[in-house]
Amino acid sequence: MSGGKYVDSEGHLYTVPIREQGNIYKPNNKAMADELSEKQVYDAHTKEIDLVNRDPKHLNDDVVKIDFEDVIAEPEGTHSFDGIWKASFTTFTVTKYWFYRLLSALFGIPMALIWGIYFAILSFLHIWAVVPCIKSFLIEIQCISRVYSIYIHTVCDPLFEAIGKIFSNVRIGLQKEI
C-alpha cells in the first residue's frame, strides 16, 4: 500500500508510509521491476540495421531516385521501335543497378572508413575544441560586458537623457492653408 490511510485498534488515524522499503532506487513491486527491466540501454554499436529500408530518414529521396523515365523520354510522334525501347529500359536499369553495386563493393568500405574518420574528427573537435572555446569566450567577454555596461550607464545614459529633455519641449504645429 502506498500513501493510504488506516485506523488502528484504538481508533487513531494513520497514513501508510509512501515507501515501506528503505532503498528508493530498487522497485518495491513486480510492476515497477518489470517496467525497469523493459527499458533497455541503447547502444549504437550493437543495433541491428534494416536491410530492406536502407534510407529510413529519407536522406536521398530527392537526389538519387533516378529511374529510366526521369532520364530518357520520347515525346509523341517521335518513338523508336518497341523492342529498342524495352531493350534500352532494361539496359539502363540493369547497368545502373550492377554498376552501383560494383562501385559500392569497390569503394563502399573505404568511403565508409573515410567518412567515419571525418565525422569522428569533427565530433572530437566539436567536443574538445569548439565548445570549450565558446565557453571560454563567454566567460572572458563578461569582463568586457561589465566595463561596457558601466560606460553606458555613466556616459551614454546621462547624455541621451539630457538630449531627450532638451527636445522634450519642442512643439510642432501644422496649419493647413486654403
Curated annotation (Swiss-Prot):
InterPro entries: Caveolin, Caveolin_CS. GO terms for molecular function: molecular adaptor activity; oxysterol binding; protein kinase binding; transmembrane transporter binding. It comes from the Eukaryota. GO terms for biological process: caveola assembly; cell differentiation; negative regulation of endothelial cell proliferation; receptor internalization; regulation of cytosolic calcium ion concentration; T cell costimulation. Residues 131-142, 167-178 are annotated as: Interacts with SPRY1, SPRY2, SPRY3 and SPRY4. The modification N6-acetyllysine is found at K5. Residues 82-94 are annotated as: Interaction with CAVIN3. This is Caveolin-1. It comes from Saimiri boliviensis boliviensis (Bolivian squirrel monkey).
